[in-house]
């Protein structure tokens, strides 16, 4: 019985180690020349790594007696990211101070394919991007990384593409119908 229990526990621990590796993800941001050589990760050399991204949209809802819900014009939240202070930080500050926009920002959530390579699984592209808020934070600890910052962006248009991976080759395939929306004109365009 002890041999079975040990073998079963070993099997479970190896299974969970593998699951963690299979679903590991990283998030990267690219802002043209400002993120060149931002990482050493193959395929993402011209990005900087970020630790979190938050995005949302909302439509006002009203209920009229007898007709059911009516959906109003959508509003898109600012995109918020969290990252370490890095080579992009001063450009973000310069952007908010001068009111200058970034022509294009890409945020990519990368996952490991069946070959263990990091590939894009979800990509958000933003056009005419303005920085609206930057907050830096730090806490004292023995081996903390670096100063962290949260940044909010607003944008004129957005495109979201999702990808699937071929289970045998690991090659990514983009969804044939990405979400595209020009917020300033309220039409599906990028």
Which residues make up each language-model segment?
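Bacterial N-terminal signal peptides
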Residues: 8-18
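Glycine-rich, low-complexity intrinsically disordered segments
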Residues: 22-190
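Positively charged n-region of N-terminal signal peptides that target proteins for export
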Residues: 1-4
